[in-house]
């Protein structure tokens, strides 16, 4: 299109033809016409921006070729256009041929090979530094762990394995940093975006502080931490005690992500899907597929929807069922996730139904409050929302109230007049700055006049002295 001289966006208009020809076979073309056309238009605009920027640089290269009486554009420059500015090599070639020039394709391929080698090298270094074989993979499946912490925070389990300094050991003692694997545990292992539990493993002789919990080889659950007291041996019985406050904080944020997901779909459209998440006791981070920034008005609507459902006190139910039954119930599945024949379905009244293996509350009212802190882009077509719930919202609102109180005190005004007072000070400062500028200009003129008055003529030459 560019080579034919078409400057305006046109590709998205062809959608009408596609819909007319294929709409019956693909009904979603009709159902989501507005959304599809908007996405095509946005992508076309982005591509045109890339083409415009690359064309400007390529024109500069062409002028250099003319000035140097050369006929071939170096492969390094062709690769730079491609790698840095996303300018396709075949388009570069077509434009060059239009004006009687050629490109060094062999040089371009050489640069491409170098780039691939750099990527392989970087990946190899990363794997060498951060990837290590899990020592638990050397054991058999008998070390597997059973998670029984959805409804209980405490149980007793037997030590199936201990890892210290990346080696399987039989015992650990006070001060040792280690990994303990139990046959049964109430500790949730990091997964589905939710961080692992923390807490205590103990018996009458020993205490092990669990800092975090992760999944390990052979379906194990790894309690990662340090021995605070006594010694622990394989086959010892240990009571698992999950930190209730931290588990509840994580559950509040996890349940809130489900409410947020539904509210986003209701407000922005059914095209919105989860693209990633992070659930910690302190806050939640939720990535979605969406093609443009979410406006303040939309964020306000989304936030209100979530808080409205919280206030409705909907029961949260978790059931294990067949994947087909879950789909029939309308459960949302995450794109790209692999599910077995049986799945865990988390329902929040009739409002939200999702497949999820994380820990949740019993009722939406336990979320307390929900507050969006920020929204922004993290990749093309992906937006990120960060939010807080429960006590974190209380602390956030308190800190804002204290900030307003301090501002009122500093500006010597009341809260309901704070904005007007701040605006008045800004205008006053602008006026004073203008007056100061005028005074300085006037003083400069006066100084110049005074300097001219002090000139002395010496043999016909005017001499100024300061």
Predicted regions mapped to residue ranges:
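A glycine- and charged-residue-rich anion-binding loop/surface
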Residues: 1-466
